[in-house]
């Protein structure tokens, strides 16, 4: 005997605001600060004398790649591309969680490069590296908060 069909489920698209309201609603309000602090990190690292290319190369890779992918996510929300996929929320949460972890590793490596640059270079390079380290930790916090807020939203 055949079992009855399962009850029909309906997929209700989420309530993603459009326009300026996107930047005022949690979790989407994290996009602009992520982009701003990410931009500051990679421009400050690029503006300094690279002490250890392997360490600061990883910082540049993480910050620049995260900046570009976050910009693509923001544009997909602004233009409504997310409506084509049902699993966009999971993808967004996984991306921001993974990026938070990668940014933490980049921030720690940037701090190490900053400590080394204190003894080797002029003070201006040290100050720029210090600011890049601080902004990298802020970006890490923003990405992790974004991941949790999109997951629990």
Swiss-Prot record:
Domain of life: Eukaryota
Domain MARVEL: 22-153
Keywords noted in UniProt: Membrane, Transmembrane, Transmembrane helix
GO molecular function, one term: structural constituent of myelin sheath
PROSITE patterns: MARVEL (PS51225)
Location of this chain's protein in the cell: Membrane
InterPro entries in alphabetical order: MAL (IPR013295), Marvel (IPR008253), MARVEL-CKLF_proteins (IPR050578)
GO cellular component entries: clathrin-coated vesicle; cytoplasmic vesicle; Golgi membrane; membrane; membrane raft; plasma membrane
Membrane topology per record: Multi-pass membrane protein
Transmembrane domains' residue ranges: 22-42, 59-79, 97-117, 131-151
GO BP field: cholesterol homeostasis; myelination
Family the UniProt entry places it in: Belongs to the MAL family.
Protein name: MAL-like protein
Organism whose genome encodes this protein: Homo sapiens (Human)
Lineage: Eukaryota, Metazoa, Chordata, Craniata, Vertebrata
């Amino acid at each position: 005997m055949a079992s009855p069909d399962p009850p029909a489920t309906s997929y209700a698209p989420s309530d993603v605001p459009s326009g300026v309201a996107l930047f005022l609603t949690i979790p989407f309000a994290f996009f602009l600060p992520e982009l701003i602090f990410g931009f500051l990190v990679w421009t400050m690292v690029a503006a300094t004398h690279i002490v250890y290319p392997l360490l600061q190369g990883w910082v540049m890779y993480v910050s620049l790649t995260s900046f570009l992918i976050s910009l693509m996510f923001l544009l997909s929300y602004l233009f409504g591309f997310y409506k084509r996929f049902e699993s966009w929320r999971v993808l967004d949460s996984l991306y921001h969680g993974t990026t938070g972890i990668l940014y933490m590793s980049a921030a720690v490596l940037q701090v190490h490069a900053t400590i080394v640059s204190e003894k080797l270079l002029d003070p201006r390079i040290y100050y720029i590296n210090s600011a890049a380290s601080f902004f990298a930790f802020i970006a890490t916090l923003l990405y992790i908060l974004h991941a949790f807020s999109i997951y629990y939203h």
